[in-house]
């Protein structure tokens, strides 16, 4: 079974491998040992559950045709259980998200849009569910702003969705903001997205966005800044009435 008790099936085996001093499954003399092998291929569901638990039961007949059987021990008597305990293979959960927000197109005058792309990648080893993206937008002076649209789910790699984001897959969201005169006066906008979701144990997993530019010396959790340079100009006309 998996660590949560869900039924599983071995990929192969148990298969007879060898017997000491010629012992076989057909005839196992006292003091002799038979060896069997088996294997299981790890699945994402097993990782999400935290691993696998396994028990083998050996059975045979004595000379009086009575059934003789024994349930397996895990071979580790230091665990406090010296007989008939599951062989447990634990797989530790390492949930993690990586969020990047970039401005894919920008304008410089009132009414122009700033379009954003937000990517959320599952960089851990367990599936993350119920992914959401929250956004914090301010002008360059720190004044609070609100996105014109989004964040809106756009796509997921290999069928990934906000409801279920497997390891290694990425969700893409879009958002936009329409430039105002106040934003131009402030010198631009600063934006941060925070992606959150739940791991299989229902723990919250979150990550604050990086701007996608590691050349700026800040490789993680830095704001996406869109600067709008001030262009001061006057046009004065004087006419004689």
Residue ranges and their predicted role:
Residues 1-241:
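Exported/extracytosolic protein signature
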